[in-house]
Amino acid sequence: MAQRDEPFAVFVFGMRLNSVRGLPRWLWGLRVLRAVEADLRAHPERGFLAGRVYRTGRTLVAVQYWASFETLDAWARDHALPHRPSWQRYLREALADPSVGLWHETYLAAPGTWEGVYMNMPPWGLGAGADLIEMQATKGSARARLREQRKRSSRPPETP
């Protein structure tokens, strides 16, 4: 079971190939995404906890876990980091050609408002970036586990 007694942020984003003429830009985006994730993993001090990229058909989806919204926001705004020039290039090109779509969602999670349960799994999802604890048989329901999380931390969720 994943345990994190501090609020954190979940950043979900993706890229969709809307037209075959956008394939070169979509493939370029995939290369950029891999490079950005490698850079984030090399610099955990930036607040990146864990993440994974998925491909389904013509859509890429990335799920990232961050130490806080502030660390995610600071990373996104830092012009010196590798993702920034790629993002600016994408914005310029997207105005001229909608063949590749981009989207993102940001969620803030406070202790007691989420759970991650992993059985017979390698580190996965938030469990790859949080402390893992053995689930106790006496706390077998989500309700009991979430109640326990809320007891450990009385801080409200952080807001941007």
Model-identified regions with their sequence ranges:
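Short S/T/G/P-rich N-terminal loop/turn motif that feeds into the first structured element of a domain
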Residues: M1-T56, A74, P98-P160
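Tryptophan-centric aromatic hotspots in well-structured domains and transmembrane helices
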Residues: Y65-A67
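An amphipathic, aromatic/His-enriched active-site/gating alpha helix that lines ligand/cofactor pockets
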Residues: F69-G101
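A short, glycine/Asx- and small/polar-enriched loop/turn
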Residues: R58-L60
